[in-house]
């Protein structure tokens, strides 16, 4: 029952703590750009429950600053998050990594970037992540899973992620319009970005299950504004960007409106529904360098009615 309001930087940071319980807190901090709502860094055994976050920067953020440590055994439940960055974020600092993280019953709204961003970009291990019961409204992106290599030679791993029971609505306009510190308009030109799971060549995101997922997109992708096709030349031209700061929009225009998956193994879609409210020139899903994928239980509602809504390129063992 504690309220924090308008910090000058990160509102609160818990660094290398053990057996920490945080319950019924309120964060209302929109005074400056770097107002993370809460940062849990290289901790072991944290429970964050029944709390509300309205923050300019990432609302609920897990970090790992120490390559010899790890952020693990974290439970977050019954929380509401609003941000001009991401609602729930693993990273960007991910030196040691994240393990055994469970998040349940989370609502994200009016959020400029991602509802869920899981980033392994600094050489750490990210594994055994469970996200269950997520409701996301007026948020620019729903799911962003990313392997990067910001420190050359430090290979990260992202393995065993389950995201289930999600309902999300992606708006056509800017989700945080009208807030005092809005997220910066960047990575243009691009139409509405899809959810994405992206590794690197030889560094695969592995074993991801998406179950009972419904995402409603505005559609309306206009090829005269920005266009990436699904031919080999166009798909191969999408940059890898291993050292770039990871954001769902970093690739600019992507060739799918629903999901873009590249450099991944063991991807399962189980009862996933993707809806575009207006015709979009792009297919719903593009798989590139994906090996082992089950997309048989996918429903696509596209007023454009394309013959091929799931494009498979340079991939093997894909069921659709």
Language-model segments: residues:
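Extracellular/periplasmic carbohydrate-active domains that bind, remodel
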Residues: 1-320
């Amino acid at each position: 029952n504690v309220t924090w309001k308008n910090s000058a930087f990160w509102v609160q940071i818990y660094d290398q703590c053990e057996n920490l319980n945080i319950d019924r807190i309120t964060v209302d901090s929109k005074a400056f750009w770097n107002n993370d709502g809460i940062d849990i860094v290289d901790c072991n055994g944290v429970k964050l429950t029944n709390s509300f976050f309205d923050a300019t920067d990432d609302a609920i953020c897990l970090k790992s600053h120490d390559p010899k440590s790890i952020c693990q055994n974290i439970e977050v439940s019954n929380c509401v998050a609003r941000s001009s960055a991401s609602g729930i974020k693993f990273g960007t600092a991910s030196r040691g990594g994240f393990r055994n993280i469970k998040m349940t019953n989370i609502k994200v709204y009016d959020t400029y970037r991602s509802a869920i961003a899981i980033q392994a970009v600094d050489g750490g291990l990210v594994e055994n992540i469970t996200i269950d019961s997520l409701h996301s409204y007026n948020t620019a992106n729903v799911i962003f899973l990313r392997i990067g290599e910001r420190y050359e030679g430090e290979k990260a791993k992202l393995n065993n992620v389950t995201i289930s029971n999600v309902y999300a609505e992606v708006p056509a306009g800017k989700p945080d319009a009208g807030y005092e510190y809005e997220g910066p308009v960047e990575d243009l030109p691009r139409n509405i970005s899809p959810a994405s799971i992206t590794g690197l060549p030889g560094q695969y995101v592995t074993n991801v299950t998406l179950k009972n997922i419904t995402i409603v997109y505005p559609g309306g992708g206009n090829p005269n504004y920005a266009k990436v096709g699904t031919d080999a030349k166009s798909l191969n031209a999408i940059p890898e960007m291993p050292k770039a700061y990871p954001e769902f929009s970093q690739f600019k225009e992507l060739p799918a409106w629903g999901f873009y998956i590249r450099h991944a193994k063991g991807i399962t879609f189980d009862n996933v529904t993707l809806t575009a409210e207006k015709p979009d020139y792009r297919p719903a899903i593009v798989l590139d360098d994906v090996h082992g994928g089950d997309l048989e239980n996918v429903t696509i509602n596209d007023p454009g009615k394309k013959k091929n809504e799931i494009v498979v390129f340079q991939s093997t063992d894909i069921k659709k």
